[in-house]
Amino acid sequence: MQHLVDTSNFSDAQIVQLLHDAKTFKAQRPPQLLRDKLIITLFFEASTRTRSSFEVAAKRLGAAVVHLDPSRSSTKKGESLEDTFANLCAMDPDGVIIRHEENEAPGILADMQMTSVINAGAGNYAHPTQALLDLFTLMEHFEGNIEGKTIAIVGDIISSRVASSGIRLLRRMGMNVILVAPEPFMPQSDLPQYENLEDVLDKVDVIMSLRAQLERHASPIFDDYNEYARHYCITEERLGDRNILILHPGPVMRNIDISDEILEDPRCKVLTQVKNGVYMRMAILKLLLLDSNN
């Protein structure tokens, strides 16, 4: 039984296999490889892209999907997460996909060894499927070679599980990572750090913009989102004609994170990320629910 709590759960060979399978699934509609599988989704936090993407991925592979709404579950009556999970596992699902506000939640459930656990986002520490779909998008764009390329992660990095997982995976795959944020948004890190976005534009091949989560910070850093945008919004004026790939995990705050014009620019791959998310999650489900059990 294998789990995906973070990308470190996968070997280099497995990541290569995921990239191959995602590319294959994107090129042609796959057979229903998981037609006898049952997956339960358990999202304790809001999700548009990740939950929908997983459900589409599972159904395209033929799996049945059951969604448990925590707001209407016995967790509201005081049942613990572990007991909720154990009761779900008594129904013999082949996997449980969980999003939770606590960093440790997916790992706690995985350690119970009752069914395969897939982390769909936990706290501010890990969002492994987002990191893997971003890797797929980058490998596709750079024709399979990202080693030595430089990515700037811009925005509220300290609050971002996307940044945490992405940094670990992209460094592992040979990319250079630099961080761009005001000091309160910056995590402790040995990576190069900049406060001024303009200082990195001639150094990078890719910018990953993150949503500014001002609500997560106790003391005001900016007066409002418009002030943040004046410093960190990815705009046509800032980019000029530089050939920089633009990514964002969503939801995008238009004209705060990325301008309307850049969202329509061919350098921006936000919707490609969403599309690739389905194929990468198909590959992940195949690996965990089929290949790992053979």
From Swiss-Prot:
Pathway terms, separated by semicolons: Pyrimidine metabolism; UMP biosynthesis via de novo pathway; (S)-dihydroorotate from bicarbonate: step 2/3
Listed InterPro entries: Asp/Orn_carbamoyltranf_P-bd, Asp/Orn_carbamoylTrfase, Asp/Orn_carbamoylTrfase_sf, Asp_carbamoyltransf, Asp_carbamoyltransf_Asp/Orn-bd
Its EC number(s): 2.1.3.2
Binding residues for carbamoyl phosphate: R49, T50, R99, H127, Q130, G250, P251
Catalytic activity: carbamoyl phosphate + L-aspartate = N-carbamoyl-L-aspartate + phosphate + H(+)
This protein's UniProt keywords: Pyrimidine biosynthesis, Transferase
GO cellular component, one term: cytosol
Enzyme class: transferase
Superkingdom of source: Bacteria
Any one GO molecular function term: amino acid binding
Keyword Signal: no
Residues the entry annotates as binding L-aspartate: K77, R161, R211
Protein's GO biological process: 'de novo' pyrimidine nucleobase biosynthetic process; 'de novo' UMP biosynthetic process; amino acid metabolic process
Function: Catalyzes the condensation of carbamoyl phosphate and aspartate to form carbamoyl aspartate and inorganic phosphate, the committed step in the de novo pyrimidine nucleotide biosynthesis pathway.
Protein family (similarity comment): Belongs to the aspartate/ornithine carbamoyltransferase superfamily. ATCase family.
NCBIfam families: asp_carb_tr (TIGR00670), PRK00856.1 (NF002032)
Oligomeric and partner information: Heterododecamer (2C3:3R2) of six catalytic PyrB chains organized as two trimers (C3), and six regulatory PyrI chains organized as three dimers (R2).
Protein name, entry field: Aspartate carbamoyltransferase catalytic subunit
